[in-house]
Amino acid sequence: MQNDFIDGSLGTKEAVGIVNRVAEVMDSFDGAVICTRDTHFADYLNTSEGRKLPVEHCMEGTKGHALRDEIQKMAEKKQAVVMNKITFGAKNLPEEIEKMTGGVPESIELVGLCTDICVISNAILLKAFYPEVPIFVDASACAGVTPQSHKNALAAMKVCQIDIINE
């Protein structure tokens, strides 16, 4: 959970409201933890995403790109891998999961921002790689661009056989 998505250039009150919950979920999670970071560069506004969302955010090396302090501390405590990603879905996520778990994971749980962009992209990517692995999204530890788009994303993930918990 990066600063720009919480109270920075693309922040929302809903994002602010889940910071402590995400830290709690990370703290109590018994397994490997991976944090993904949206990562953009100076040419962002000239990219496909930048043309459709012309708001600079998560620019590499900025405070907005960094994980929120509470999340960074928890990532350190849990010895999390922090992955930069340049697309909504982290294309190397399955590879990293298998490195950390020594093979196909027993289950996967996702939390964070934004439910309707990155979380859903990663959930569907992981479901494609691991069709028999239970994939959970903790709705109480996610927030979307809007409350309605959060709900829509949860509904879409259910249709794709992703298990939504704590809704």
Describe the residue ranges of each PLM region:
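Short, function-defining helix-loop hinge/capping sites that tune catalysis or transport
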Residues: 7-8, 46, 92, 120, ...
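Active-site acidic carboxylates
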Residues: 1-82, 103, 136, 145, ...
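Short beta-strand/turn micro-motifs composed of small residues
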Residues: 37, 112, 139
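Histidine-anchored nucleotide/phosphate-binding helix
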Residues: 21-28, 120-130
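Short hydrophobic/aromatic-enriched beta-strand-loop microsegments
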Residues: 131-138
